[in-house]
């Protein structure tokens, strides 16, 4: 008991707790009166012990995403939606320098409440950075120093028979870890439904991947709908916010994703939409004096391209996948110019078709124009030959799409679909 008396004397920190066996952790959990400790995973148990210890000492245990105020050197941890709030935690410049903290790091630690003339909570001690020991944060390689490769690990999106859209994506526009994908969507073609299906497929099939859904300039009710139906992080800046806020939120989400990739994690950002982000930059950047048709400044493209271009598969481990929607046929020339500018930058495109949506054929995916570059790295060779046979037989008519979807719905999985296809091809050859 004497040994366990004080975590402070023992130097109870995240690295010492990680080296302990579960039996020892349970002893600490009992000492700090952690409830239901036997049901927690090791990582959750460590954080529960640190939290209980901080509370026993009269402090809070809090965490938030770091935003450094560049001109001042200090920063704030943003616990709510990556945006400034009354619950922000002040972190001093000396702590930032000591642990080599960067924008987007999720910092956890012991926090004291604000004194009478202060506005913010104050961080007293850094306990963890991105869930790891703070000392290990110093040894990370910076994101630009990591080696980008083509995606070579397939992200399986197929979940159940009824979710046809993700099955079509797996067949005709497969997504790999590290994909930079553009979902080209006219209005009312079902892009929100598609994003929700993709998000739920990722959380079901790849629970280890970190999912962030980023909604820029969207309707507030749509944000609520997605928050309730998606298990990942949903970060939003609705259309009633100023463009500066859209930019701030988007850039902090990108920094957060980069920090996770530096820790060799797989991160997926689903973004709606890159068009609205480019419009926000167009309003905020100082005018360069040149204007493209539609009234957009060419200088406004640099930073949204930096955002989209950050998606990559990393040789050293980890990946950043970005699937962003681009709006077309909205009646705005500017939106078309933005799409044209981003058209060649992705390595996967999924086109939604207004004609199909008007005929109530859902998912309204234009299967001819959708596809992935270097798909041979993601699809097995025997499946690839069959897919190319399907592509050769494709026509532009909506009837073909309807027939293709009917065939898909008749099979329980893509494997079964390929097996049926192989039999059909064999029968044709024998005739």
What are the functions of these language-model segments?
Residues 38, 43-137:
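N-terminal "pre-motor" subdomain/linker immediately upstream of P-loop NTPase catalytic cores
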Residues 49-51, 68-70, 79-81, 93, ...:
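Flexible glycine-/small-residue-rich
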Residues 181, 189-192, 197-431:
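P-loop NTPase catalytic core
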Residues 101, 114-183:
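P-loop NTP-binding catalytic core
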Residues 62, 120-125, 142, 151, ...:
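A generic structural signal for well-ordered coil/turn residues at beta-strand boundaries
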